UniProtKB/Swiss-Prot annotation:
Biological pathway: Glycan metabolism
GO MF term list: glycosyltransferase activity
Keywords of this entry: Carbohydrate metabolism, Cell wall biogenesis/degradation, Fucose metabolism, Glycoprotein, Glycosyltransferase, Golgi apparatus, Membrane, Signal-anchor, Transferase, Transmembrane, Transmembrane helix
Name by which UniProt lists this protein: O-fucosyltransferase 20
Tissue: Highly expressed in embryogenic microspore and in vegetative tissues.
Lumenal side: 80-555
EC identifiers of the protein: 2.4.1.-
Consequence of gene disruption: Increased number of lateral roots and wider stem diameter. Altered cell wall composition with an increased level of de-esterified pectins.
Membrane-spanning intervals of the chain: 59-79
Annotated positions binding substrate: H330, L331, R332
Subcellular localization: Golgi apparatus membrane
Main location: Golgi
Gene source species: Brassica napus
Known glycosylation sites: N111, N124, N371, N503
Amino acid sequence: MALPKNGGNSSSTKKKVSYISVPSQIINSLSSSSLQSLLVSPKKSSRCTNRFSYRNPRIWFLTLFLVSLFGMLKLGLNVDPISLPFSRYPCSTGSFDEHHAVSHLAFASKNDTQSSSSSEHRKNETLPTEGDFWKQPDGLGFKPCLGFSRQYRKDSNSILKNRWKYLLVVVAGGMNQQRNQIVDAVIMARILGASLVVPVLQVNVIWGDESEFADIFDLEHFKNVLADDVHIVSSLPSTHVMTRPAEEKRTPLHASPQWIRAHYLKRINRERVLLLRGLDSRLSNDLPSDLQKLRCKVASQALRFSPRILELGNKLASRMLSEGQYLSLHLRMEKDVWVRTGSLPGLTPEYDEIVNSERQRHPELLTGRSNMTYNERKLAGLCPLTALEVTRLLKALEAPKDARIYWAGGEPLGGKEALEPLTKEFPHLYNKHDLALPGELEPFAKKASVMAAIDYIVCEKSDVFIPSHGGNMGHALQGQRAYAGHKKYITPNKRHMLPYFMNASLPESEFNRIVKDFHRESLGQPELRTGRGGKDVTKHPVSECMCSDRRQQQQ
């Protein structure tokens, strides 16, 4: 299926030219020989014929008509065909919003796409910089390489035979936050030499999604991929059902394997069942090489979405891909995001007051650094980009105006009004509700985690991905796109950009140059995770989980 094109927007030119235009239907109706006869002077005729023509008034009228037509054609043919003010759809109003309201998503025919390919090719030739936006970074030949050490494989034999101690975990937060905790749960089970019971997904107080592990992820695939690393069971065996687990809620941030063994190994050996809660960011980012590889294996290979979610997500991605390249944005503009980040949407004073009131009623929702003002947070790069700021960023990065854009995320505070700056400059903007056929999303209407998984799939398959505000989904996709060959991932440099966003006197051309320069090294190129800088290996898989023969040859 093909996405709709906004035929009402003609290409802009650097200079406005006054001209008399001739409808393309007239020009096309003339054969090449007819045009040639009009443009080439006729041969001299005989004197007898001239006398006859001189005395015949009909010849005078015919000559006058041909001269007039010749003048009109000459003026028309001198005009750049790209600048002719004719829409590809003669009856189109050019209004995206009206067209979008009539039918969620209309799809152009294949023939229509083919008929315009030559004109679009010429347009691309006049705007060569547009191709740079879609250009992929050099992955330096890095590919996944998860070769575990001999000692790791030897230890696996004894760990997998152990069926008498079990680790239970409860993971909280949104889908991507839960995903990170599941990865760490597998690592902790390996460290403790315990079998892992399939993690329990805690119902989130904001989204209220009661989905279980198997509703979101492919459970059998999860077990099979990790069969050589950790023994995974769906539930406690009958011999342990009546056992009261030792519960722990106070695991410190960034705990090392040594700390976990020192504090939990005796307890799980004694009680046989250990229950852990609140695992978010509890496991250290700096682990032994084999455990880092296991982290990558869980995140990039074992945690595959359930078949039902994969099928729908792939369908929506195929609809975006049906006409070629597309960009995906993760927009964080929901009310709870503005509240939690201590930020303001900047739409109207009324919307700012809504956010401030909600934050005063629920101060516990504010995530960290509560002593900072909104302006301090904004300048520190701790606030999500607004739709206007995303638009200016895309223009500075030379995104084509006709780029097809998929935006992921929940309903923005302010609805369509919040997205207006983006839709005005980039009208081909879609989300999952626009792409889905009637009834396709209905089974998941109240499943926020499933909706997030669908967004994840469509964003993962895009040619370019840009998050408006970090977050767990952005981090997960950064690692996944790197693992898939370093597909383009643009990290907005908010802290450096924002002073220029606020400088109203800065010419747009200078603003664009500065912003583009800020992002030359933030396009998804391989980033070595050297030393112990605390970077998450699932976000930066080079070089523990990826290796390159080409890089070794260059060295």
